[in-house]
From Swiss-Prot:
Biased composition (Acidic residues): 693-706
Predominant subcellular localization, coarse grouping: Golgi
Organism: Emericella nidulans (strain FGSC A4 / ATCC 38163 / CBS 112.46 / NRRL 194 / M139) (Aspergillus nidulans)
Keyword Membrane: yes
Protein's name according to its UniProt entry: Conserved oligomeric Golgi complex subunit 6
Organism classification: Eukaryota, Fungi, Dikarya, Ascomycota, Pezizomycotina
GO BP field: intra-Golgi vesicle-mediated transport; protein transport
Region (Disordered): 1-35, 686-706
GO cellular component term of the entry, any: Golgi transport complex
Keyword Acetylation: no
Highest taxon in the source lineage: Eukaryota
Pfam annotation, one family: COG6_N
Function: Acts as a component of the peripheral membrane COG complex that is involved in intra-Golgi protein trafficking. COG is located at the cis-Golgi, and regulates tethering of retrograde intra-Golgi vesicles and possibly a number of other membrane trafficking events.
Assigned keywords, A-Z: Golgi apparatus, Membrane, Protein transport, Transport
Length: 739
């Protein structure tokens, strides 16, 4: 369809004249007045038009684009030209629409043809659908069935893979011909997992299936554990614990078997019996057959049987070394992989509640205790042989020091074994019993020795020098060796501890090795008739005993206090004896006896009473002069004689202190006598005269005339002689002479 512009091109001439062109006059035009009005109206209309309107503006723009020249012709033809262009455009449009209509007709015929074709195809489709619907329905059902079958197959495969053990695996698990290896443990772990997972089936709708699978897995597990149990027993027969490279398979087998406590305990019993036999044989070999092994440097322990301490020490050292080696080997065998074995045993205990003795008590497995118990059981035969030999060798020796050294040795090893295998183990209990047995034998030896001494009267007689008897010296020598042994032993107590608590480990030894001999020594003092000799003898016994035990706090804590108390009593007796000796030898005792009524308790007596002292027989001139002379003869050697009086006391310090206190008591007695004499003179008025005489004599020329005259004067007055002049010694002089 031809196309064209509905408007003439710019610059084309237009037949339409402009609106403001002057219209031509016509004879038919209205009158002039009307034309004027029309023109006025036209102008008004033109002037009233707003050229700001968009339509006007567009029209003007279009007109401007056409390139129209403002001429009269153009203005006249403008409207016609425009209308002609409009008509031409409309004609062109009509032609185009005609073409469109023709094309639409052709399209309509095509659409009709397509509609008929579609209807025909729809009919065929309906017929095909009617034919294929049953097939599709059947195919859909088959697809659903296929999906269900595939799901069931996957479930079956998963169930079979998880819950069903193949025949090959069961054969490896239960057949005796098959070895115990990693495959066995893998299958066993899988069967145990199946057995545990069957509980989930029991809780669901598949109870019967769960029961069947659980029963089957239980039978398989029981067969597997029985196979493992027999294999471990077989391995135990040829197991060498001394081999540092113990098979890891047997360790794993033990950890697995631990989940069956009854089977595991039976295996341990079998193992303990086997090890007991092996270790007993090794102990017997070490005792008797060491030389036959080819090493001439190693001699049998029996070679030192004559020396109980070395013999028992060698046996205990062998047992200790064997125990340490056995424990290390068992730790490698049972505890090397951490606490897996303990976990297995604990799981087995929890799975067998019927094996508990007390249902309310929850059993907890202690691995270290079980290991110590097993080591003790392995050494039962060795312990039995050790006990027999120790008891035999102890019974054959009567040396108390050796017995006590054996006691300390047993105590030392008892402490070691208590730490190594536990305080309640067989070895610790055995050593405790042997220690008690040896102590009883030691006490028996001491009792026999005491009985022998008690029947020997010559041994009980006190020596002439009143020193401690020989049997006491011998017993103290033995006691010293015992105390040195105890001090050097492991069980010696801290002095601070023994000072707080009297009883200690050494107290029974003191009761057996010291007390009976000490009692005999004290009893033998009864044969001495002289009290002073008896006191000296007992003092020597106590001093000797005290000096022996003093360096050892564990002995002094129990026995020093009674010894010190008795020595204090004996010291008082010897002090009184020395005091009496000084008084009797010096003659002062006569004056003290005479002055007894005028003792210090009666110091408040009147002068008349004190004056009566001069009338006492002991204070008469001759008697008082004799006493004064005796005192003068005594004083030069008094201290030496008094010290010599206690020369048989075997402690110079003790003798010195006793003598010094006796001298001090003597000086106090002399001071009392001196005071009474001065008091008597003063009461009689003689003391003042004597004082005057002394003063005058000191001031005179020394010819004594005044003194004689004074005496005559006194005699004439009847006052008597001055006691002070008859007994001139002073307390100061006595102290100086006896110092």
């Amino acid at each position: 369809m031809a196309t064209g512009s509905y408007f003439p091109p710019p610059g084309a001439p237009s037949s339409i004249s402009p609106r403001n062109s002057t219209p031509a006059l016509s004879p038919l035009s209205p009158p002039l007045q009307q034309r004027s009005n029309a023109l006025s109206n036209r102008l008004t209309s033109v002037l009233s038009v707003s050229y700001a309107d968009s339509d006007i503006r567009d029209a003007l723009e279009t007109l401007s684009l056409r390139g129209v020249h403002n001429t009269a012709e153009v203005r006249r033809q403008l409207r016609l030209d425009v209308q002609k262009e409009v008509v031409d455009c409309n004609a062109e449009i009509v032609r185009d629409f005609g073409n469109v209509a023709e094309q639409l007709k052709r399209i309509g015929s095509v659409i009709s043809s397509l509609k008929e074709t579609c209807d025909e195809m729809r009919k065929h489709i309906v017929l095909a659908k009617q034919d294929t619907t049953p097939v599709l329905e059947e195919a859909s059902a088959l697809m659903i069935q296929k999906q269900e079958a595939e799901t069931k197959q996957r479930l079956l495969d998963a169930f079979t893979k998880h819950f069903i053990v193949s025949e090959e695996e069961l054969l490896a698990l239960t057949s005796i011909e098959e070895p115990i290896d990693d495959e066995f443990f893998d299958v066993l772990a899988r069967v145990k997992q199946v057995h545990r997972d069957c509980e989930a089936l029991l809780g669901a709708e598949h109870e019967r299936l769960g029961l069947e699978l659980m029963e089957k897995s239980s039978r398989s597990l029981n067969s597997a554990y029985q196979k493992l149990y027999r294999w471990i027993q077989k391995e135990f027969k040829s197991l060498n614990l001394e081999d540092p490279q113990i098979s890891g398979t047997i360790r794993q087998a033990l950890r697995v078997l631990a989940e069956r406590p009854s089977l595991f305990q039976t295996c341990l019993d079998f193992f303990a019996e086997a090890r007991d036999y092996v270790l007993s044989d090794a102990f017997h070999y070490a005792l008797t057959d060491a030389v036959s092994g080819g090493d001439s440097a190693v001699k049998p322990i029996e070679f030192s049987a004559h020396d109980p301490l070395r013999y028992i020490g060698d046996m205990l050292a062998w047992v200790h070394s064997t125990t340490v080696s056995e424990r290390e080997a068992l730790e490698t065998l049972f505890v090397a992989e951490g606490d897996e074995l303990a976990k297995g045993i604990q799981a087995g205990l929890n799975s067998e509640p019927w094996s508990r003795i007390d249902e309310d008590e929850e059993m907890t497995f202690d691995g270290q205790k079980a290991l110590s118990d097993l080591v003790s059981r392995d050494l039962i035969g060795v312990a039995r042989s050790l006990r027999q030999r120790v008891e035999l060798v102890i019974q054959g020796h009567d040396d108390p020091v050796t017995c006590y050294k054996v006691i300390n040795l047993l105590s030392f090893y008892q402490t070691i074994f208590s730490k190594l295998v536990g305080p309640n183990s067989n070895l610790a209990e055995l050593l405790k019993a042997l220690e008690k047995f040896t102590l009883n034998h030691f006490q028996t030896i001491m009792r026999d020795e005491v009985n022998n001494i008690s029947t020997d009267h010559s041994a009980l007689a006190p020596p002439d020098d009143l020193s401690a008897p020989q049997f006491l010296h011998d017993s103290l020598e033995v006691l010293t060796a015992l105390m040195k042994t105890h001090e050097a032993s492991l069980g010696t107590e801290d002095p601070s501890i023994t000072s707080e608590s009297e009883e200690n480990e050494f107290t029974p030894v003191l009761h057996a090795a010291l007390d009976p001999f000490f009692t005999l020594a004290k009893a033998s003092a009864d044969e001495l008739p002289d009290p002073t000799a008896r006191a000296i003898y007992l003092t020597n016994v106590h001093i000797t005993t005290r000096s022996t035990i003093s360096p050892y706090p564990f002995a002094t804590s129990t026995h020093l206090p009674p010894l010190s108390a008795t020595l204090s009593t004996l010291r008082v007796e010897l002090l009184e004896s020395q005091h009496r000796y000084l008084l009797d030898t010096s003659g002062l005792q006569v004056l003290l006896t005479a002055l007894q009524p005028f003792s210090q308790s009666n110091e408040s007596g009147t002068e008349k009473d004190l004056a009566a002292i001069a009338d006492l027989p002991a204070f008469q001139a001759e008697a008082l002069i004799s006493t004064s002379q005796q005192l003068d003869d005594f004083l030069p050697s008094a201290l030496m004689d008094a010290t010599d009086n206690l020369k048989r006391v075997q402690s110079a310090t003790f003798v010195k202190s006793v003598t010094e206190e006796a001298v001090e008591a003597f000086c106090r007695d002399f001071e009392f006598v001196e005071g009474m004499i001065i008091g008597a003179d003063e009461a009689r008025g003689v003391g003042q005269s004597d004082g005057a005489v002394n003063e005058e004599g000191e001031e005179g020329d020394g010819d004594g005339d005044g003194e004689v005259e004074l005496e005559l004067e006194v005699e004439q007055r009847g006052q008597g002689q001055s006691l002070r002049k008859l007994f001139p010694r002073t307390t100061g002089e006595i102290r100086v002479l006896l110092s």
